[in-house]
């Protein structure tokens, strides 16, 4: 009996340490879902590391990380929430890099055409919305909503539209409202609009109408796997994947 126990112990001690595979937890803005999934799939073919992804609104993810969520990397849809973690002492300032850029568009359900109108025409907005609401992410917390508010303010129609909003917890939920026809118009990222054949882009907002839409990537610790993942993201292969999903490259 003792020999059996010793034999089993030796086998256990010499067995491959499958559980020792390093794990990276990547917390990323909802608008990055499809692109990050593709990046993870490509990276996993070449590296022996487990990548766990968590998606949501940047504000929600930042607060989860502040509360102790086990994130190794955080991809925000704006600089504010990455800076928030820097201010909280959870990320060093030199551990934040810009991953990609995006743009903002107005969308409608593909099956529900709307008459063309000028962004500055408040009456035309009211006519297009009729008895419904404009789908946007939360304008005071979620980056996509914050950019939408800035764009509407720039167009001079914010006072008329502020009470006509259907605000959601993240940009993908705003997209879904338009996809289902529950909102006749919505403001989302170009990358989100390109993913759905259920919505059509009505027009794009000028880059001057809102702050630059940048995606900072914050490194929360010094795991060796973090450095390898970051090096991969700078590669041509990773940049091509991001561009395939409509993201724009950014020079640091």
For each feature predicted by the language model, list its residue ranges.
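Short active-site segment of divalent metal-dependent hydrolases/proteases
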Residues: 75
